């Protein structure tokens, strides 16, 4: 089976889940799947995907896995006790052919946030691996290894010694086995330039650093859970700070567009959070504006981190490093380009939260094609509230 452990997911699912347990245990949410590749027919693979999800829902955390989580400084004991009882339930997920009859499939995840938050990453990994295992029966492993070696070598040139990358590629990986190979090669070839992985299973298995803080779904849910819509981003950041007390201090900047983020990210947040993550829009313009914002708030940019994670490849990593090196702390999270580049077109698939407590929620990305909402009227209202054109 594809997913062999409930740890085979991104760290930020655990960090967000802990906030949900402590602050929003009664929240009810809905997620929907979308494949952005035109012409891809996923319908023939529905039964195989269902079988993998059935297996996923049979998994439990082992004592060794719980002990590992207990050893992470930001994970609290009551959360680990909850995970000891936790399992995913099939009753919260439905998969069927889309009504559009164009090869798309509908995957709807609906239920208590606390009991559905762990579906997204493994389900996306399942869809990917089911699809590629059936469309590429004899993968071009040698080509994949050649490309990987070339990419990693491009980061070991003189002058790039402090350029560090991390793996953010679980959800869109070619396969579990290839993912592990990529991580082992990255650590072997890059040494200290390999910062770690977002994947908790591989971090535990290979003694790597697990990385991650928050995702868009957390800030989106706060549109419904906060005191009023305009204050939802501030509410989300303040709630995060109350939970982690200065730990896990990387804020995600594009849920409501970067302009709205800068308006909300005042001197208090600039000093409190360790840095900011970029996930859409022009990264060079974003970085310049973020550094200028820190300076305007009388915060030394060199004390803060800029994390880049939007569709990175190695040439872009190098260009960003050369632009911002010595001006701030830097980190780069590389996803699909690292874990799914054997010469085939990767699937552009996502699972996004669309409702919380019966109300629509949305992300106003700095890349319009990333915006996903099933209620156009709410999307227009959200843009008006946050001043997004």
Curated annotation (Swiss-Prot):
Top enzyme class = ligase
This protein's pathway reads: Cofactor biosynthesis; NAD(+) biosynthesis; nicotinate D-ribonucleotide from nicotinate: step 1/1
List the catalysed reactions: nicotinate + 5-phospho-alpha-D-ribose 1-diphosphate + ATP + H2O = nicotinate beta-D-ribonucleotide + ADP + phosphate + diphosphate
**Signal peptide: which range, if any?**
none
Q: What does the record give as EC number? A: 6.3.4.21
This protein's GO CC annotations: cytosol
CDD domains to which the protein is assigned, alphabetical: PncB_like
Q: Which GO terms describe its biological process?
A: NAD biosynthetic process via the salvage pathway
Whether Cytoplasm counts among this entry's keywords is no
Post-translational modification note: Transiently phosphorylated on a His residue during the reaction cycle. Phosphorylation strongly increases the affinity for substrates and increases the rate of nicotinate D-ribonucleotide production. Dephosphorylation regenerates the low-affinity form of the enzyme, leading to product release.
> By its UniProt entry, which InterPro entries does this protein fall under?
N/Namide_PRibTrfase, NAPRTase_N, Nic_PRibTrfase, Nic_PRibTrfase-Fam, Nicotinate_pribotase-like_C
The Gene Ontology terms for molecular function here are: nicotinate phosphoribosyltransferase activity
* Database matches in Gene3D superfamilies: nicotinate phosphoribosyltransferase
Keyword Electron transport assigned: no
Modification Phosphohistidine, positions: 216
Superkingdom, according to UniProt?
A: Bacteria
Name the Pfam families for this protein.
NAPRTase, NAPRTase_N
Query: Keywords on this record?
Result: Ligase, Phosphoprotein, Pyridine nucleotide biosynthesis
Q: NCBIfam families of this UniProt entry?
A: NAPRTase (TIGR01514), PRK05321.1 (NF003704)
State the protein's purpose. Catalyzes the synthesis of beta-nicotinate D-ribonucleotide from nicotinate and 5-phospho-D-ribose 1-phosphate at the expense of ATP.
Q: Which family does it belong to?
A: Belongs to the NAPRTase family.
Q: What is the designated name of this protein?
A: Nicotinate phosphoribosyltransferase
User: Source gene?
Assistant: pncB
């Amino acid at each position: 089976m594809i997913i062999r452990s409930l740890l085979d997911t991104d760290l930020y699912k655990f960090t967000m889940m802990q906030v949900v347990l402590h602050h929003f245990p009664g929240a009810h949410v809905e997620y929907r799947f979308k494949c952005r590749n035109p012409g891809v027919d996923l319908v023939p693979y529905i039964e195989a995907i269902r079988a993998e999800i059935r297996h996923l829902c049979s998994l439990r955390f082992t004592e060794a896995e719980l002990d590992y989580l207990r050893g992470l400084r930001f994970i609290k004991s009551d959360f680990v006790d909850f995970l000891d009882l936790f399992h995913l339930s099939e009753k919260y997920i439905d998969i069927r052919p889309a009504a559009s009859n164009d090869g798309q499939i509908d995957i709807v995840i609906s239920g208590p946030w606390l009991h559905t938050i762990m579906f997204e990453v493994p389900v996306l990994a399942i869809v990917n691996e089911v699809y590629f295992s059936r469309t590429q029966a004899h993968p071009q492993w040698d080509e994949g290894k050649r490309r990987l070696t070339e990419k990693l070598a491009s980061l070991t040139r003189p002058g790039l010694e402090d350029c560090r990358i991390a793996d953010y590629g679980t959800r869109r990986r070619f396969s579990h086995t290839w993912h592990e190979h990529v991580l082992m090669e990255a650590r072997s070839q890059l040494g200290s330039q390999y910062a770690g992985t977002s994947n908790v299973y591989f971090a535990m298995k290979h003694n790597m650093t697990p990385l991650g803080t928050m995702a868009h779904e957390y800030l989106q849910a706060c549109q419904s859970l906060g005191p009023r819509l305009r204050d939802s981003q501030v509410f989300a950041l303040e709630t995060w700070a109350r939970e982690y007390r200065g730990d896990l201090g990387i804020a995600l900047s594009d849920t409501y567009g970067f302009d709205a983020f800068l308006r909300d990210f005042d001197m208090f947040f600039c000093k409190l959070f360790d840095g900011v993550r970029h996930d859409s829009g022009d990264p060079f313009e974003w970085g310049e504006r973020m550094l200028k914002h820190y300076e305007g708030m009388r915060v030394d940019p060199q004390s803060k981190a800029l994390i880049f994670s939007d569709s990175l490849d190695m040439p872009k990593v190098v260009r960003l490093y050369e632009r911002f090196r010595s001006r701030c702390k830097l980190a780069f999270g590389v996803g699909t380009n690292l874990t799914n580049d054997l010469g085939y077109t990767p699937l552009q698939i996502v699972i996004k939260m669309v409702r919380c407590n019966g109300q629509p929620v949305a992300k106003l990305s700095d890349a319009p094609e990333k915006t996903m909402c099933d209620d156009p009227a709410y999307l227009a209202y959200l843009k008006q509230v946050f001043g997004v054109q």
